[in-house]
Amino acid sequence: MDICMDKEPDGVVVYANGDSCNPNQENVSEPLLDSVSRDDANVHTELRYGEENIEVNEYDVKECTSEIPVGKPIGDDFESKDVTKSSLHAKHASKSGRGNNKTRNTVPQPFSLATEKRASSTRSFTSESLESAGLKKFPDGHSKVQSQATKVPRKPLQPKNKKLSDEEDSCSVASYATSGAKSAKSRTVVTAAPSFRSTERAEKRKEFYTKLEEKHQAMEAEKTQSEARNKEATEAALRQLRKSLRFKANPMPKFYHEGPPPKVELKKPLPTRAKSPKLGRRNPKEGNRAKGASRRHETRKTLVISKEDHDDETTRNADQINHKEMNRNLEPETAFAC
């Protein structure tokens, strides 16, 4: 059996056929023997890893003592010796176990036992490594804790073509069923009546419309009030303008109130009556009489005609007298006409 240990964090892979240590190859022909051999190899590699850690610790202690010549504490020597003894005992046990595996036939065991054995071996190794990497006392008298990271190799990967057994499938189905039942019990919801939001929306809409109506009414009232105020202001401005348009006249003079001066009344003579002339042949006597009558009418005086004298002399003298009187009466009328 060849053991191939890689220092990568993927761990250690052991092959029973003696092939090259390629971690990608898979041995499918002998799965049970491969698993047992891998467990033994893991134990052996873990022990070797513990020995390397112990040797490193001893080397560090020796360097410290060589640099500073101070007496080593006794407790550290005893602890280191105990660790070396336990590691040697584990080596002998692993060698004897490998020889027995070659001679005896392997018995098929379930996968669970191999995992338990691997877990127990890792626990024992970690406890030993922690004891070895404990407190270290330095010669200056101060105690310091040196924590070394214990690298635990990973478990080998299972081959890809392995399938779960029927028992594991049944267990997984049963566990899934139980978990589903528990979740169903925990998910029990109390039934309640459905609450519709349409009623709430209708109420909100109604409130909104009422507020809108109130707002519109307030705006209309304010508008009417503003119109009334503007009307009153315009009327007051018109009144002031009319008052300013009235003009004030100065008092009239005295002669306007007094009447015109009285007019002098003129005495007019009475109007004369028109008389149509007699047309035709006239006697000389009648002609003279007509002339005298016209003159009398013109002078507006009645003349007393004496008895007709048959004598021409008497008539001529009377005519002359009347003619003089007429001239005297006509003088004031001609002066007024001018």
UniProtKB/Swiss-Prot annotation:
Ubiquitinated. Proteasomal-dependent degradation in the dark. Residues 210-240 form a coiled coil. Expressed in roots, root hairs, cotyledons, hypocotyls, trichomes, flowers and siliques. Its main location: cytoplasm. It comes from Arabidopsis thaliana. This is Protein WVD2-like 3. One of its GO terms (biological process) is unidimensional cell growth. PANTHER family: PROTEIN WVD2-LIKE 3 (PTHR46372:SF2). GO terms for molecular function: microtubule binding. GO terms for cellular component: cortical microtubule. Residues 68-204, 248-338 are annotated as: Disordered. Residues 97-109, 121-130, 172-189 have a biased composition (Polar residues). Residues 74-84, 306-331 have a biased composition (Basic and acidic residues). Induction: By light (at protein level). Down-regulated by dark (at protein level). Microtubule-associated protein (MAP) that regulates the orientation of interphase cortical microtubules. Binds to, bundles and stabilizes microtubules. Required for the organization and stability of cortical microtubules in hypocotyls. Required for normal hypocotyl cell elongation. Acts as a negative regulator of hypocotyl cell elongation in the light.
